[in-house]
Amino acid sequence: MGDAKEAGAEGPPAGAAAREGLSLLSQAESEESSAQGSALFLGGNEVKSRAVVKYSSAPPRTAFARLEEKTDLKLPPANWLRESAKLGPAGTTILGNSKKSKPFSSFGMAYDFIDSVGNDVDVVSDSENIKKLLKIPYSKSHVSMAVHRIGRTLLLDELDIQELFMRSSQTGDWTWLKEFYQRLIDQKWQRKKKSKEHWYQKAILSKFLYYSINGDGAAQPVSSTTEQQESSSSDQTNDSEGASWPAPFEMPSSVSEDPSASSQGLKNDFVRNILWTFEDIHMLVGSNMPIFGGGRYPAVSLRLRDNNKPINVLTGIDYWLDNLICNVPELVMCFHVNGIVQKYEMIKTEEIPNLENSNFSTKVIKDIAQNILSFLKSNCTKEGHTYWLFKASGSDIVKLYDLTTLCEETEDKYQNPFTMPVAILLYKVACNMMMKKNQNKKHYGTIRTLLLNCLKLLDKSRHPQIIASANYMLSELFQLDEPKKEENSESPLNENSDESYSEEEEEMPDSDENGSYSTSSDPSDDSNAVAIIKSVGELSVPEKYKSIHQIRPSCAFPVCHDTEERCRLVLSYVLEGLKSVDSSIKKESDLPAADPSTPIPLKYEDESSRGGPEGLEKQMALFLDKMGSLQKGNYSSQSGMIPGSWQHKMKLQLILKSSKAYYVLSDAAMSLQKYGRALRYIKLALQSHDTYCCLCTNMLSEVLLFLSQYLTLCGDIQLMLAQNANNRAAHLEEFHYRTKEDQEILHSLHRESSCQGFAWATDLSTDLESQLSVSCKCYEATNEILQFSDLKSQNPEHYVQVLKRMGNIRNEIGVFYMNQAAALQSERVVSKSVSAAEQQLWKKSFSCFEKGIHNFESIEDATNAALLLCNTGRLMRICAQAHCGAGDEFKREFSPEEGLYYNKAIDYYLKALRSLGTRDIHPAVWDSVNWELSTTYFTMATLQQDYAPLSRKAQEQIEKEVSEAMMKSLKYCDVDSVSARQPLCQYRAATIHHRLASMYHSCLRNQLGDEHLRKQHRVLADLHYSKAAKLFQLLKDAPCELLRVQLERVAFAEFQMTSQNSNVGKLKTLSGALNIMVRTEHAFQLIQKELIEELGQPKSGDAAVAADASPSLNREEVMKLLSIFESRLSFLLLQSIKLLSSTKKKTSNNIEDDAVLKTNKHIYSQLLRATANKTATLLERINVIIHLLGQLAAGSAASSNAVQ
């Protein structure tokens, strides 16, 4: 590339005068403006032009030598056709003696300026082609150009029909186009040789330019013999232009990407590449025009004209456009007569359109440019297709053909020599867009279209590297980790525009060029043409072909409605890429043996100059490095891939992509609860990863992170399968299903590896313990990966999630072993000792809980740590239950082992509460732990009370321990908070109070001596009975418990009455006992209600009703309690009657006592009659009791009122 100084030197001096609507900016100014991003318009009202030299290989500009008058240009100068220091390496090119530009010149430029292709530039072409297009309305000569579309950029190249047909005669290629062309012009094709005059004019021009750079030593003629040789050499050079055409795709696949292909003309041969903006058209133009400078003329173009032939319009346009494209403000014209120099004339670029005999409108040229571009944009719609813009010599009709479509009808569609360069360019543009870090996702549709069109053009067997890479890039376009937000596609463009064009005609100036093609009738109704301009005159009409179309068809990214569809699309591209890689891998045994008689060609060509498919390896390597650099292994794979080869690198990336896609599919299946399918996909993901590991020894941290994610998901799936054992058959069926695509990808993986590295994690077991164990191993493996790499610190959130899962699975396994131990315990009936199997299960369960607690504590997850501590407490309670005496119930005592394990359980529950800190952190868990702690204290106290260890401890000590445990149980039993557990808490509290009251009642009965202690026990018993009754009164489903408490209270009153001596004290106690009896009415009402509901149920026993109904009463218990109640009520009433009667004899006129006595006698007589009726049903007996209690309550109330 030329440096900035060279590029800047191409511009004219600042402040160049503006005349007739055109002005030019210096190169420095235009570059500066471009950098600032502001639009600069050159010229006044007619046209705007701006040129920026992007590249220049020209040497520093030197002043031209003004030749003396009468200099004979027919004599060659001494330096003719020789290199010169003033010319630099491109000397002959600068001076116009090179061959004409190669057929692929636009591709060479496109490769060099890949950033501009597809978006920024409308046209890439040789300046000669641009000029030829803009002169169409003025010229009768033929036009034959190949047009290709890449994104919104059109590539224009000359399509030399003569050369093609010469090639066809020699090789048999392109016969289809030859036949088509002959049908088109309706006559045999004949090649016309260029005239002697043509070669004479070229030689004169060449000698003139050499004289102009040779300075004082210019006019040094050489011998006529030398001149003839040089001239002959020049003619031969010019006449052999055909060698620049590449061979079509006829080479065997083994050499299809050989470096020698770079000689096919894909290099950028131009001295200058210029970004030319003409009005609103942005063009990348290649130019070889010699530019002189220095002294008075900083930048001029030099032209030679025959003084006898005036400049015509075509020549004027030619000169004007050349100067405009190269930003040259002046033209120096040297006039000669028969090769003898006459004079020089300086012309400003702006003055050229107004020269005599060469008058043309710059505005019309602008209209022609805009119309031609619009015409091509509207009709060259298919990316990758080769279009042929053709105008026969002398014709006014311009036609556009789609050669790709015509070629596809032939036997070998790869006969089109443009196919490969177009495919490479499509690939390079896509690759360039992909490698841009900040590439907006909205361009993904464009990239995808470029790549798909590239793939359409390539033969799979001949270009596996590009095909594999393109497929990989297609797979990279789809974001697997998040749903793709689709953007609305733009309205699709009409690919084959059949607009009717205007048929107006106008006279055009005669051409001064002799056409080498025969004029044909050119019927305008050619069915093979994509589009037709019926008259070149239409091109001069402003906005005649104003494009209403977009440059490209809709490139919207495909809408994938769900994750599976997106992943399947990715996997289809991955599979195609893998197939390409696999097909290109040949083991040494398959390679042909070297023939000793055949020389091995040595290639000395510079690597950097490559332009064909062989030059893509460097670009692909860059792309792969961009996506994640690879560490090379030092071994060969099973398939024979060489580490570091393109196959090795590409297969690694494709395999990694497949593993990601399968992981996302597995995750999606997991969310749909399709666990069998999820396990199948994660198995494929891990098999892909295993193959990756086999190919790549040094693992990247990114890949290790993927593996940790795969194993985490695998652990999740195994856990869910363990928890959903009911659908095992369905899961199994889904797990074993395989699509054809999956099988083919797996086949490619098996070429490199056995894929068994993670088989332990992906087997679908029917054993619950095995599934839980595998899940745990997956999480443990993930934890190890994160621990022994930098990933733990780089991905703290992922690490926390893994530890949470480890804690959770260890809890699950702990619970599993704990439940197994409990099951064994329930089966153990005869044996008194704990079995070794039970103890082993306890150890396993405890170990899992302990590790899980450690996992949660390490990430400060207090809630889950508390839950696991709670489960450990439950395990301790199971251990305690296992140690209870299994012999005779009457001889059983609460054992020290039971006490030990219950106290351990209490310790774990208290740790859980400490872990939570306060209820605010997690109220539900806090309440649950409190309940379990209360239950443990209650169970331990109950067992100590029921099976008092009197052989080891004194009665008083046991009573004290029971009392303390019961009070602690009450402390952790929340009866006030409204929740689903509140009735249970109330029942528990009532039961505790009942048991404490019973215990103090029993102590009072059995205790002699210490009156203070007896009084304390009496008070405590009364207090707890009262609290128990109140709490049972709140419950709707505990009438029997309430009745029992009240009967015990009555018994307690009776016991107190035995120690009383005075009748008054006894009457008071009896009155209190009868009041307790009255308060049992609520319990009897509840029993009555349930009995009535039972009777109301249909005899057939509707299952649904039975299910919804509350648990039926224990009739046996109710009858037992009722009998006790009847006997105690009868006893109390009788005692009351006796005491009141004896009191009445001693004292008279006590109205209250009389009323009570009367009421009690009446109730007592009714009770005796009721109890005597042995045929009465339970409900009838209850009804009688409720009735009697009502009378008793009414009598008590009446007596109270009388007293008042």
From Swiss-Prot:
Keywords: Activator, Nucleus, Repeat, TPR repeat, Transcription, Transcription regulation. The gene is EDRF1. InterPro entries: EDRF1_N (IPR056582), EDRF1_TPR (IPR056583). Pfam families: EDRF1_N (PF23788), TPR_EDRF1 (PF23723). Residues 496-513 have a biased composition (Acidic residues). Transcription factor involved in erythroid differentiation. Involved in transcriptional activation of the globin gene. The lineage of its organism: Eukaryota, Metazoa, Chordata, Craniata, Vertebrata. TPR repeats lie at residues 693-726, 920-953. Disulfide bonds: none annotated. The keyword Amino-acid biosynthesis does not apply. GO terms for cellular component: nucleus. It is found in: Nucleus. Residues 9-30, 223-241, 253-263 have a biased composition (Low complexity). This is Erythroid differentiation-related factor 1. Residues 1-30, 220-264, 483-527, 586-613 are annotated as: Disordered. GO terms for biological process: positive regulation of DNA-templated transcription.
